Curated annotation (Swiss-Prot):
Pathway: Amine and polyamine biosynthesis; betaine biosynthesis via choline pathway; betaine aldehyde from choline (cytochrome c reductase route): step 1/1. Involved in the biosynthesis of the osmoprotectant glycine betaine. Catalyzes the oxidation of choline to betaine aldehyde and betaine aldehyde to glycine betaine at the same rate. PANTHER family: CHOLINE DEHYDROGENASE, MITOCHONDRIAL, GLUCOSE-METHANOL-CHOLINE GMC OXIDOREDUCTASE. It is an enzyme of class 1 (oxidoreductase). Pfam families: GMC_oxred_C, GMC_oxred_N. One of its GO terms (molecular function) is betaine-aldehyde dehydrogenase (NAD+) activity. Belongs to the GMC oxidoreductase family. It catalyses: choline + A = betaine aldehyde + AH2; betaine aldehyde + NAD(+) + H2O = glycine betaine + NADH + 2 H(+). FAD binds at residues 6-35. Its cofactor is FAD. This is Oxygen-dependent choline dehydrogenase.
């Protein structure tokens, strides 16, 4: 059985759905969109209710549930590496934090050969094109894009405001918009949530526009086996449907576009014969093209939580108690309001820990409850926590296919905490977080430090806590990087070096990880490259101003000094 389309897109995630929607705006263009997972069931509260964000990570229906190899600098821990499965990809299971990265990230990309048109001002029009912000557009934000973005509102949890004030009292800037003129500092955090309180995945935002178009064919439960080649040209794919072992073939007249994410995209290329020769030969995979960078340069964000007891009954602890959950669910289901309608990450911040960092190297998410991100180990009392993580670790990992079998997960190694900079940033980060948490704004709420605990003070004690408790922020990227050097996989338009009719478009093509959550930037990348594929002129460069710290001090004098070990 064979079918023919102009474009085949492998992966209906944040990038794939964006591409499928934009390419099929041209009525004469046919697109096949393949997704290994199932539909984004709209009546499943686990993916649709923002406050239920921990649930999809606990099962396998919506989560690939990858695990790393034993991480050598983390006491040999096998670390969780959840990725979204189903229409929407990781936008179906992520934390819905709408953060774009720092302007300097993109200006840094644009300094690399071949990526000159990836400056922040080149990218900003595509961020705006993708977005509808609930309080309206401005120079930084869009008003009629597919991604619904909600801003924190008056009357939300008082802990959000106290934590932002504490950051300012500790000597850091205040910012009104982490995606606007100035990322650096503390302020309210936007989220990818609709005005009706539903998750704004790319399945909802993009595919809802496109799925009824006659020129778009969507196949779910379709696991792509490999890309087919005629010489160095990609001409199609084979895929498996459900549990079947029968391979279905589809042909691409123009291009095969791999949008399977930073774990699966390099794995698919390797299984198809595009990758490091030695690896392919060791797996008995015929080499179509020796491309050593496929699966290399893997990057992620690591984070940990500092948890505190809350002395006033204002945290979300009661919402964890089963007898309170039916009322929360009913208010969300029928009104789209209440605790269920927010991811509860409504405040955050970005800071520099040392003067040598030209832009922030630490991100904060504040949460008005003490619990693990995946919903486990909830503290049995009122509490709150700060998620703290480093943004641009020098650590580099890799993805390697283990066999030709598309159902076998690849070997994943991030090499977390493999450099001295990593340890320095996390030690600094914990100590600076404690200083923030000790400021007067939190006096009405702050109880004892639950985790790590006030007794954990020395470098050695902090390092032990980091090794045992740091977790992924679920931001794998950069494993098929853009560029022109020997380890680059694609050019600045996502075209695979040395091949024809083959692109990669997703978070794997970032050359360097960004400062913040990845989803908004992944969508922007797909918006930008879709114009290239369609032969359209790029959107005019923005003229918006943006903050550069320059010689500004890392922080001012804190209102309350804290002595630490």
């Amino acid at each position: 059985m064979s079918q023919e389309f102009d474009y085949i897109i492998v992966g209906a995630g944040s990038a794939g759905n964006t591409l499928a929607t934009r390419l099929t705006e041209d009525a004469g263009v046919t697109v096949l969109l393949l997704e290994a997972g199932g539909p984004d069931y709209r009546f499943d509260f686990r993916t649709q209710m923002p406050a239920a964000l921990a649930f999809p990570l606990q099962g396998r229906r919506y989560n690939w549930a990858y695990e790393t190899d034993p991480e050598p600098y983390m006491d040999g821990r096998r670390m969780e590496c959840g990725r979204g499965k189903g229409l929407g990809g990781s936008s179906l299971i992520n934390g819905m934090c709408y953060i774009r990265g720092n302007a300097m990230d993109f200006d840094g990309w644009a300094e690399l050969p071949g990526l000159e048109d990836w400056t922040y001002l080149d990218c900003l029009p595509y961020f705006r094109k993708a977005e509808t912000r609930d309080i309206g557009p401005n120079d930084y934000h869009g008003g009629d894009g597919p991604v619904s973005v909600a801003t924190p509102k008056a009357g939300n949890n008082p802990l959000f405001h106290a934590m932002v004030e504490a950051g300012v009292q500790a000597g850091y800037p205040r910012t009104e918009d982490l995606n606007g003129y100035q990322q650096e500092g503390f302020g309210p955090m936007d989220r990818s949530v609709t005005k009706n309180g539903r998750r704004s995945s790319t399945a909802r935002g993009y595919l809802d526009q496109a799925k009824k178009r006659p020129n778009l064919t969507i196949v779910t439960h379709a696991l792509t086996d490999r890309v087919l080649f005629d010489g160095k040209r990609a001409v199609g794919v084979t895929y498996l449907v459900g549990d079947s072992e029968e391979r279905v073939e589809a042909r691409a007249r123009k291009e095969v576009i791999v949008s399977s994410g930073a774990i699966a995209s390099p794995q698919l290329l390797q299984r198809s014969g595009v990758g490091p020769r030695a690896l392919l030969e060791s797996l008995d995979i015929p080499v179509v093209h020796d491309l050593p960078g496929v699966g290399e340069n893997l990057q992620d964000h690591l984070e940990l939580y500092l948890q505190y007891a809350c002395t006033q009954p204002v945290s979300l602890y009661p919402s964890l108690l089963w007898w309170n959950q039916p009322a929360i669910g009913a208010e969300w289901l029928f009104n789209g309001t209440g605790i269920g309608a927010s991811n509860q990450f409504e405040a955050g911040g970005f800071i520099r820990t040392r003067p040598e960092f030209k832009w922030p190297n630490i991100q904060y998410h504040f949460l008005p409850v003490a619990i693990n991100y995946n919903g486990s180990n909830g503290v049995k009392e009122h509490g709150f926590q700060a998620h703290m993580g480093s943004m641009r670790s020098p650590a580099r990992g890799r993805i390697q296919a283990k066999s030709k079998d598309p159902r076998q997960h690849p070997s994943i190694l991030f090499n977390y905490m493999s450099t001295e900079q990593d340890w320095q940033e996390f030690r600094d980060g914990i100590r600076l977080t404690r200083e923030i948490m000790a400021q007067p704004a939190l006096d009405p709420y702050r109880g004892r430090e639950i985790s790590p605990g006030a007794h954990v003070q020395t470098d050695e004690e902090l390092d032990k806590f980091i090794r045992e408790h740091a977790e992924t922020a679920f931001h794998p990227s950069c494993s098929c990087k853009m560029g022109t050097d020997d380890m680059a996989v694609v050019d600045g338009e996502g075209r695979v070096h040395g091949m024809k009719g083959l692109r990669v478009v997703d978070a794997s093509i970032m050359p360097l990880i960004i400062t913040g959550n990845l989803n908004a930037t992944t969508i922007m990348i797909a918006e930008k490259i879709s114009d290239k594929i369609r032969g359209r002129k790029p959107l005019p460069r923005s003229t918006a101003k943006y903050y550069v710290a320059g010689d500004a001090p890392v922080k001012g004098k804190p209102m309350r000094e804290v002595k630490q070990g």
